Structure formats: structure tokens, C-alpha cells
């Protein structure tokens, strides 16, 4: 057998749970890259990870590199022999260096001449002699932001390392990893399992589970936790809220998962469920349980890392731990209810938003005015928008949000309802921050959209206005996210808003705060750049985006319509020919000095092909005008695609730059007219 399975395990102290998957995946990727570089064939490779170990398993790994022939080229034949045909010193030196005589060399003929060459056979190195060094290099390249040292060793890693095991089949690979000598001993679960001697790479998972009480396969452990949590929730008539991020973290915290169900006092359900869920998931790593109507139940599911003889004791312990946190939430909620959001407005004057842009009170005053302005343009209730904007940051001054920061906006919504604010105002309190992350939904309620846009635009214009635009990866005010949010809200709700108008209004509301005279232009450019990034993420071809960007449409909903239209046009059979023709037209018109002619004189249409093109354009223009007016760009481009034959024939038969000045100008006017029809939508000459 010319191959064996390889197992490498690193036994450590508890690894950071949020980094565990990335560490394991990177270890595997780095090691397989090493195998490829070393020309070592293998069938497949997988990673394993648990809180106190990283491991990789490579199946059917070649036991040695394949032998290979290495071509060693010597001097040119013309300089390898003298006039009498005897080898020169250069030829003899080269031959001696390769352990041969000159007459043993072969000859290689190329287009640059004839050369001496020696095809040396290089025997492959045994795999076992390469593994330790490759594994160490793979570990050295792991993404570890803050490595640490332990004991007296100078070795650094993310956590202290206690064991290293490298087995190729049943053979122990000699060597060290991070200063630890490779050995067969594998540690088990800290409390339940026992350590053992690993006899063969193939037995790693089985022995670790049976003797060590560790499920090393991360994905299996994750699936087990999810399935058991769902079953546990179903037993009490509910559904577990299992977000993947939390499931990943819990999976990374346990080696032997045991899913248990606990409860808390029903009185806590009087507190908004978001606050309870926040502390259960964020602080305790518990899975909340909801009924079929989406109402929080007084239960939670947690995952223990031990199989106890008395699970009731573990359940009681977790209930005891979570109770004070829920009691805190209850206390904060009851205390906050004693004061309205409006009464908290003066306290916003004590919180600085940004040194040059004023306090949070200044910010909400601007948001209120800008939200009302936006609402007037979109048909939303401007009074509600102004009110929601004014109150938008008041929940930041509540005890609940100060303690549970991720509940900002959500608690504002609950407090607004308790204060008797309109539902539109209350909903806007929560939705003002949307979208919070890539893939998050955008607000859809009209007032919410106005407030969310106002908040983001105020920040964008303000920060650019004081000359603190994002540089490189640094973006302390999350302006890129704010910009994408502005575009998505307008596009996905098809709002009739113009960026230039919005930016100008936001700048006006900042008054004399802004020192950057170019702020409005810079914000617009920034938003246009975000358009490109957003559409690229959606899979839109770059040339389609550039074709639309060339027209600088500043209404995002209109921009989106053009993108969709050009994407559709690109799929039409005529698109490539018309794109090429537009490029040709663009080049011709670019060479014209002075103002381009625009009037077509039918009497000067001498050739049949130019008559046909002019007639086709004249036929289409009355149909195109209403389509352009209604932004039905897709239908407009579909109609324009019918020009292909006429355009092709024109360039086949007509000399545009005729000697006759009148004929030339008439043809230029025809081409200018043709190009202008396409430019109503995009510059399709940029399509590849």
C-alpha cells in the first residue's frame, strides 16, 4: 500500500470559542497547501475542533513524493565545445557539478539554439520526514491576533499547548509542534473522560468518543446540539430560538454536549421579551423558547459540558444564575416606565455625539427636521416623522439600554407605546437602525424609512463635513454601513428621493458646523462607490454597473431600474453588436471639435443605409419618449435592440467622415441622435 491516513492533533487549554472554527479551518487550509507544495497526493482532508483541541485528518496520503525528472540545462553547445570539438571548461564544470561527464549530457534544441542538458532523476522524499515541519508552518500561519507564552518557553500560540500527536497510519511521526514532542497520548474530557494512547490514525474519533468522552467532530457536535435542543423545546410545547451564531459559540464551548431544559418565574414575562432574550442569549448562552404564536415561554434550553448523575442540580444552578439578570431587567423596566421618553430630551444635552457636530440633542433636532422633509417627499406623515426623529435617541438614556446596549431602539419602541405615542412613532424608534448588518431587512413603514434615512444622512454629511471620511479599513462611525443602508432603504422601498436634494438638506441643517466645503460632493461620490460595491455583492457584472454610473443618476430607485434594464439588455442577442456600435459611435463623436450637430436633414440622407437608420429612429422615438418618462428602461432598451440590423448596415455601407462637410455633419447628427437614445438609460458602449 502506497498511502496511509494521517492524524494530527494539538491538545491545548480552552480555545476562544468565537475563533475555534476559523482556527481549525485555517489549520486545515494551511496544511493542505503545504501538501500540495510538497507534491504529496491525498484523497481528502477534514478538520476537527473542540474546546481543548485542534485536529486534522488526511485520507490516503501518499507515503512518499513521486520520483521526478528535473531538467538541468547547461551551456549552449556553441560555447560548450572549442574549435576542435573538445569540451570547454564551462561545459566540464557544469557536467562535474551534476555528477556526469560531458559526453553523458543530452542535447536540447529550442528556437533560441541548442543546449547541453541533463535530465536528473530525483527520488521522492518519504512523507513522514516532512510532516512535522509542514504542520508547524501551517500553525505558524494561523490568524492569531494576540498570541501568548506559557511557562518558561518562548513558544507563542493562542493558548498553552500540552500535547501533540502525529500518526501516519499506526506509525508515530517524530518531531515537535510548538515545542511539544509528538506522542501517542491524547487527553480526554476534563472531568468525564480518560486519556489514552492512540494506536492508529483511523481510531481517533472512535476512541476519543468512547474513552475520552469528547465528540471531536465539530459539525456532528453542532448537529447533535441543535437536534436535542429542538426536541427539548418540543417537549414543553415550544420552539427553541437557535440562531446559528449562538449555536456555533455553544458548540465551541462544549466537548460532550448535554441539552437540558430550565425555567424562570412567569412574572418576568411582563418585561419586554427582547430584554429577556438579550440576557439569556448574550450573557448566558441559553436558547429561549417561544410558543406557536411567537410569545416567549418561561423556559430556556442550555447545554452542559458534562453528563451529571443529578441533572436537576445543574438545572437549578443555571436557573439561579439567570434569575438575578432577569430581575435586573425587570427593575430597569419598571424604573424606566416612571419617565416618558420626552422627559429625557434634556438629558441628551449631556451626551456628546461628536465634538464639532454637537450633542445628541443637537443630532435629534436635525434628524427631526430632516425626517419631516423626507416624509413630505414620500407621502409619509411628516408630523409623526418629526416626532419620531426628536425622540429617536431618548431610549439611550434609559437604565435598560445602558445595561443591555443591544436593546436600543427596541426598548424605545416599547417605551413609546407606553407613553401613548402613535404606532408609527413607536415602530420608527426600533427600525431607525435598520439595516444593522449585511443581509438584515430594511424598514418598510413610511415614517420608519424617513427617520432611518435622516439619521444615516445626518451622520454621513456631518462626518464628511468635518473632514473625517473613512480611510482604508478604518471606519469608526460605520459610514460604509450607513451609506449602504441609505441606498437599500430607498431602492427596496422604491422611494422617489434624490440623493443630491437629501445631502443638500442635511448640510443645511448642520449649519455652520461643517468645515469641509466639498462635503456634499464627497458624500455623493461615497454613495456612488457604495452603489458599485452593493451591486457587485449582488452578482451584477461590473461593466453593467459602470454603464449606469456613467450617467450619474442620483435617484437610487431610478439607478436600480437602470441596472435591471441593462442587465436584461445584456442577455439579448443584439446587445454585444449594439455595445460595439455604441463604442464606435462614441469614438467618432469624441474626435469632433466644437459642438456636435444635432439636427438631421432628411434631404441629405444620401445612402439607403442611413435613410433606413434615420427612419427606424424616427419610428421608435415616439414610442421611447413615454418609456423614458416613466423610467421603463427595460422596455426602452428592448425597443432599441431592434436597431441592430439598421446600425450594422449603416456602418457597413456609409462613410461617416465624408469629404462633403454637410453630409458629414448630417451623419454625425444621426449618430449623435442614436447615441442619445441609449444614453437616456446608460452608456452601453462600456459593456464588454
From Swiss-Prot:
<keyword id="KW-0963">Cytoplasm</keyword>
<dbReference type="GO" id="GO:0006426">
    <property type="term" value="P:glycyl-tRNA aminoacylation"/>
</dbReference>
<dbReference type="GO" id="GO:0004820">
    <property type="term" value="F:glycine-tRNA ligase activity"/>
</dbReference>
<keyword id="KW-0030">Aminoacyl-tRNA synthetase</keyword>
<dbReference type="InterPro" id="IPR008909">
    <property type="entry name" value="DALR_anticod-bd"/>
</dbReference>
<keyword id="KW-0547">Nucleotide-binding</keyword>
<dbReference type="InterPro" id="IPR015944">
    <property type="entry name" value="Gly-tRNA-synth_bsu"/>
</dbReference>
<comment type="similarity">
    <text>Belongs to the class-II aminoacyl-tRNA synthetase family.</text>
</comment>
<keyword id="KW-0067">ATP-binding</keyword>
<keyword id="KW-0648">Protein biosynthesis</keyword>
<dbReference type="Pfam" id="PF05746">
    <property type="entry name" value="DALR_1"/>
</dbReference>
<comment type="subunit">
    <text>Tetramer of two alpha and two beta subunits.</text>
</comment>
<dbReference type="GO" id="GO:0005524">
    <property type="term" value="F:ATP binding"/>
</dbReference>
<keyword id="KW-0436">Ligase</keyword>
<dbReference type="GO" id="GO:0005829">
    <property type="term" value="C:cytosol"/>
</dbReference>
<dbReference type="GO" id="GO:0004814">
    <property type="term" value="F:arginine-tRNA ligase activity"/>
</dbReference>
<dbReference type="InterPro" id="IPR006194">
    <property type="entry name" value="Gly-tRNA-synth_heterodimer"/>
</dbReference>
<protein>
    <recommendedName>
        <fullName>Glycine--tRNA ligase beta subunit</fullName>
        <ecNumber>6.1.1.14</ecNumber>
    </recommendedName>
</protein>
<dbReference type="Pfam" id="PF02092">
    <property type="entry name" value="tRNA_synt_2f"/>
</dbReference>
<dbReference type="GO" id="GO:0006420">
    <property type="term" value="P:arginyl-tRNA aminoacylation"/>
</dbReference>
Amino acid at each position: 500500500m502506497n498511502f496511509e491516513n494521517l492524524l494530527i492533533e494539538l491538545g491545548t487549554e480552552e480555545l476562544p470559542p468565537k475563533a475555534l472554527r476559523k482556527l481549525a479551518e485555517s489549520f486545515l487550509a494551511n496544511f493542505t497547501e503545504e501538501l500540495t507544495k510538497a507534491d504529496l497526493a491525498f484523497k481528502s482532508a477534514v478538520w476537527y475542533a473542540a474546546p481543548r483541541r485542534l485536529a486534522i485528518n488526511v485520507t490516503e496520503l501518499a507515503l512518499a513524493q513521486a520520483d521526478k525528472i528535473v531538467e538541468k540545462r547547461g551551456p549552449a553547445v556553441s560555447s560548450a565545445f572549442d574549435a576542435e570539438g573538445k569540451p570547454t571548461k564551462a561545459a566540464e564544470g557544469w557536467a562535474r557539478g551534476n555528477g556526469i561527464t560531458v559526453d553523458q549530457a543530452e542535447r536540447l534544441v529550442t528556437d533560441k539554439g541548442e543546449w547541453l542538458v541533463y535530465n536528473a532523476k530525483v527520488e521522492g522524499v518519504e512523507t513522514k520526514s516532512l510532516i512535522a515541519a509542514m504542520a508547524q508552518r501551517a500553525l505558524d500561519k494561523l490568524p492569531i491576533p494576540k498570541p501568548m507564552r506559557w511557562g518558561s518557553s518562548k513558544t507563542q500560540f493562542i493558548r498553552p499547548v500540552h500535547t501533540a500527536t502525529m500518526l501516519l497510519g499506526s506509525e508515530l511521526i517524530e518531531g515537535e509542534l510548538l515545542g511539544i514532542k509528538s506522542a501517542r497520548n491524547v487527553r480526554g474530557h476534563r472531568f468525564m473522560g480518560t486519556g489514552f494512547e492512540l494506536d492508529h490514525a483511523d481510531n481517533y474519533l472512535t476512541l476519543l468518543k468512547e474513552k475520552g468522552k469528547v465528540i471531536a467532530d465539530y459539525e456532528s457536535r453542532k448537529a447533535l446540539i441543535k437536534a436535542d435542543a429542538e426536541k427539548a423545546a418540543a417537549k414543553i410545547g415550544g420552539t427553541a430560538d437557535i440562531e446559528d451564531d449562538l449555536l456555533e459559540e455553544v458548540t465551541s464551548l462544549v466537548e460532550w454536549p448535554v441539552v437540558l431544559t430550565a425555567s424562570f418565574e412567569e412574572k418576568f414575562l411582563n418585561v419586554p421579551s427582547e430584554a429577556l432574550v438579550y440576557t439569556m442569549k448574550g450573557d448566558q448562552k441559553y436558547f429561549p423558547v417561544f410558543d406557536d404564536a411567537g410569545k416567549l415561554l418561561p423556559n430556556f434550553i442550555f447545554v452542559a459540558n458534562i453528563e451529571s448523575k443529578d441533572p436537576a442540580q445543574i438545572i437549578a444552578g443555571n436557573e439561579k444564575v439567570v434569575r438575578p439578570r432577569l430581575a435586573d431587567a425587570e427593575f430597569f423596566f419598571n424604573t424606566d416606565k416612571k419617565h416618558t421618553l420626552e422627559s429625557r430630551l434634556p438629558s441628551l444635552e449631556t451626551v456628546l455625539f461628536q465634538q464639532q457636530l454637537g450633542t445628541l440633542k443637537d443630532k435629534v433636532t436635525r434628524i427631526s427636521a430632516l425626517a419631516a422633509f423626507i416624509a413630505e417627499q414620500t407621502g409619509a406623515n411628516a408630523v409623526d416623522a418629526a416626532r419620531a426623529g426628536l425622540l429617536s435617541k431618548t431610549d439611550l438614556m434609559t437604565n435598560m439600554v445602558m445595561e443591555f446596549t443591544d436593546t436600543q431602539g427596541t426598548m424605545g419602541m416599547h417605551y413609546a407605546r407606553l407613553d401613548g405615542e402613535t404606532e408609527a412613532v413607536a415602530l420608527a424608534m426600533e427600525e431607525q437602525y435598520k439595516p444593522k448588518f449585511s443581509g438584515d431587512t430594511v424598514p418598510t413603514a413610511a415614517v420608519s424609512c424617513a427617520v432611518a434615512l435622516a439619521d444615516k444622512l445626518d451622520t454621513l454629511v456631518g462626518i464628511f463635513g468635518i473632514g473625517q471620511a473613512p480611510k482604508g479599513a478604518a471606519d469608526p462611525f460605520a459610514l460604509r454601513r450607513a451609506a449602504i443602508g441609505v441606498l437599500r432603504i430607498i431602492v427596496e422601498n422604491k422611494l422617489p428621493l434624490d440623493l443630491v436634494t437629501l445631502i443638500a438638506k442635511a448640510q443645511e441643517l448642520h449649519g455652520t458646523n461643517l468645515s469641509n466645503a466639498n462635503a456634499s460632493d464627497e458624500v455623493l461620490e461615497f454613495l456612488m462607490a457604495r452603489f458599485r460595491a452593493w451591486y457587485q455583492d449582488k452578482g451584477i457584472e461590473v461593466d453593467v454597473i459602470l454603464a449606469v454610473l456613467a450617467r450619474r443618476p442620483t435617484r437610487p430607485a431610478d439607478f436600480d431600474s437602470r441596472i435591471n434594464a441593462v442587465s436584461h439588455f445584456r442577455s439579448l442577442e443584439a446587445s454585444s453588436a449594439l455595445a460595439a456600435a455604441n463604442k464606435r459611435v462614441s469614438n467618432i463623436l469624441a474626435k469632433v471639435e466644437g459642438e456636435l450637430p444635432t439636427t438631421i436633414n432628411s434631404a441629405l440622407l444620401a445612402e439607403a443605409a442611413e435613410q433606413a437608420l434615420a427612419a427606424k429612429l424616427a419610428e421608435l422615438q415616439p414610442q421611447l419618449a413615454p418609456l423614458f418618462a416613466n423610467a421603463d428602461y427595460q422596455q426602452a432598451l428592448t425597443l432599441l435592440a431592434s436597431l441592430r440590423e439598421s446600425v450594422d448596415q449603416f456602418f457597413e455601407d456609409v462613410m461617416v467622415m465624408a469629404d462633403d462637410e454637410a453630409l458629414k455633419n448630417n451623419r454625425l447628427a444621426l449618430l449623435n441622435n442614436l447615441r442619445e437614445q441609449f444614453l437616456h438609460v446608460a452608456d452601453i458602449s462600456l459593456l464588454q
